[in-house]
């Protein structure tokens, strides 16, 4: 009882919290038992944990994660353990004070000389009570002593937990508890909602509702939502968009802030040289999106041999994904295009981590001065690409516009778009309005306006060498055909003249049908398998090149409708040919070049 005797004279230290948490007196399982108490007292409702995302903290508007959240969990655990330990120390002091009062009562009734031991030293408080106290006083004193001893034991146990290692262990044990452990799929699982600084917007209606931790939203837009917000700077930025494409662009960008992928699996590629205003518009959109938007690496879509696929992880949970300035001569990775656009889930991994699979939520906008090269000819690739031209060039101050597409520029616009408080709010209102329109149309994007159709067709014609060859050299004709060898020879000769790699027979057989179809030539047979040659079918071959200076020269390409060649092919009855197509004659090419708007029609027997 000597420890209690020593504590009787100590002052009582009161703490703001009187809560006491009892752990095993033998210190067995102290961390696990402490974790239960910590989770219930200070973590539930404030913190969540997911193995892939780590700790997240509710900050009043969203669940915020990262290393800071982990540090805050550890500090919260440390403060709680420290507070409980100090409460037990205060309990020891309070019980000691109770014992001191009992001793004082006895000492007032017993003379000092009687409270002295044989060796002349004063008796200890406990000995005084046992020697002179009443039955009631002894019972009260023993009760206080037992309580103090128990509190002191608990204080020692909790004090032992006040090390970095124990605090981290307690926090780790809390991660798997109900109400804290959360599946990744539960976060940001409301694609129709947008978390703004003043509440949560239902993008289907534009209505605002209060923030709610039960929604488990981790993202936050860059402004408060006000449907009436306007900004002269934002209106000035939007004036750079082609007027015939402005509403289309608004609805497209409105769809991009939802958690739904584009209904047509498309990406918008903003095309145009420098000083055309597209960067200013995307600055406003990115500011409005806040953490819902992100600038992503062009390596996601531009082929780089041997690259590590970690960039795809940037798309996890993202809504508006912006890719700025693809490299000149960059070649579009069509495989990754199909992996990232129009697929319900994406599999990726962080460096030195295992693969994970997550739902696709993003919409991609590409800003580029140089259109990526697209080697693919298939419809599946080109249906995903929409080129948005930015028609104007904004000139430096003092330079007078001389062309129809030139405008007087404002060099202060972009920095002001980047800093003005009203721009983010106005851009957010514009985006939400576009989203509401998209939902009102049944979540169907509007038809592409003429500028987009024309720019995309031009891009495809430039990129698709097969399409360009077909448009310049071929025409549909149901009764004509071109043998596989002849078409390959002519096509590869064209590629060689352009300094491009030639195609193998297999590549032509696999890809040229899509080019023909895009050129409006729906062939009825391809060299993939033999086609039956009927009596009325006639072989087509290119016109021979005119001899230089009238001097004939040999040619490895057979002349148009060579009787011997036609008879040889017809005798086979089946052959590997392109059926339903023929070469344009030189006369037809001259006619087309003289009147580009006139449509050429194939005439049987021509």
Task: Identify the function of each model-found stretch.
Residues 55-58, 208:
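Amphipathic alpha-helical packing elements
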Residues 57, 62-80, 84:
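Trp- and S/T/G-rich repeat-edge/linker motifs of beta-rich repeat architectures
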Residues 1-10:
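N-terminal acidic, proline/glycine-rich, low-complexity intrinsically disordered segments
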């Amino acid at each position: 009882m000597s420890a209690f005797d020593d504590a009787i004279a100590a002052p009582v230290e009161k703490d703001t919290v009187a809560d006491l948490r009892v752990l095993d007196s033998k210190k067995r399982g102290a961390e696990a038992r402490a974790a239960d108490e910590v989770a219930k007292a200070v973590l539930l409702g404030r913190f969540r944990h997911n193995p892939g995302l780590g700790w997240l903290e509710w900050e009043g508007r969203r669940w915020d994660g990262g290393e800071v959240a982990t540090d805050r969990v550890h500090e919260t655990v440390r403060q709680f353990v420290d507070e409980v330990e100090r409460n037990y120390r205060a309990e020891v002091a309070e019980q000691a004070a109770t014992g001191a009062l009992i001793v004082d009562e006895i000492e007032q009734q017993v003379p000092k000389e009687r409270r002295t031991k044989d060796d002349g030293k004063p008796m200890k408080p406990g000995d005084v009570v046992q020697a002179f106290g009443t039955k009631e006083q002894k019972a009260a004193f023993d009760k206080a002593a037992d309580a103090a001893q128990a509190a002191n034991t608990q204080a020692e146990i909790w004090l032992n937990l006040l090390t970095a290692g124990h605090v981290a262990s307690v926090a780790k044990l809390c991660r798997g508890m109900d109400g804290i452990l959360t599946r990744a799929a539960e976060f940001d699982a409301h694609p129709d909602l947008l978390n703004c600084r003043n509440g949560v917007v239902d993008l289907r209606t534009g209505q605002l509702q209060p923030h709610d931790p039960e929604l488990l939203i981790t993202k936050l837009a860059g402004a408060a939502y006000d449907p009436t917000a306007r900004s002269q700077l934002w209106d000035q930025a939007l004036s750079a968009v082609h007027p015939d494409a402005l509403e289309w662009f608004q609805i497209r960008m409105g769809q991009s802030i939802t958690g739904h992928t584009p209904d047509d699996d498309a990406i918008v590629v903003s095309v145009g040289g420098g000083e055309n205003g597209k960067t200013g518009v995307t600055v406003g959109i990115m500011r409005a999106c806040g953490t819902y938007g992100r600038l992503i690496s062009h390596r996601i879509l531009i082929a780089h041999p041997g690259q590590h696929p970690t960039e795809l992880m940037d798309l996890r949970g993202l809504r508006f994904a912006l890719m700025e300035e693809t490299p000149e001569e960059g070649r579009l990775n069509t495989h990754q295009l199909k992996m990232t656009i129009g697929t319900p889930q994406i599999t990726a991994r962080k460096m030195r981590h295992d693969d994970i699979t997550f739902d696709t939520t993003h919409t991609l906008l590409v800003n580029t001065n140089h259109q990526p090269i697209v080697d693919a000819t298939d419809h599946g690739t080109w249906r995903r690409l929409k080129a948005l031209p930015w028609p104007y060039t904004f000139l430096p101050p003092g330079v007078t516009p001389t062309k129809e597409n030139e405008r007087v520029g404002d060099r202060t616009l972009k920095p002001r778009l980047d800093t003005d408080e009203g721009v983010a709010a106005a851009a957010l209102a514009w985006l939400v309005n576009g989203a509401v329109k998209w939902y009102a149309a049944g979540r169907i994007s509007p038809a592409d306006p003429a500028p987009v159709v024309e720019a995309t067709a031009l891009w495809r014609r430039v990129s698709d060498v097969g399409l360009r060859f077909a448009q310049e050299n071929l025409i549909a004709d149901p009764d004509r055909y071109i043998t596989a060898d002849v078409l390959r020879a002519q096509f590869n000769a064209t590629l060689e003249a352009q300094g491009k790699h030639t195609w193998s027979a297999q590549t032509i057989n696999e890809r040229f049908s899509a080019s023909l179809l895009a050129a409006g030539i729906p062939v009825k047979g391809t060299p993939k398998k033999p086609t039956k040659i009927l009596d009325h079918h006639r072989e087509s071959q290119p016109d021979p090149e005119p001899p230089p200076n009238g001097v004939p020269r040999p040619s490895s390409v057979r002349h148009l409708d060579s009787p011997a060649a036609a008879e040889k092919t017809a005798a086979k009855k089946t052959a590997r040919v392109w059926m339903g197509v023929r070469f344009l004659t030189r006369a037809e090419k001259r006619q087309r070049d003289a009147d580009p708007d006139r449509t050429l029609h194939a005439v049987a027997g021509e």
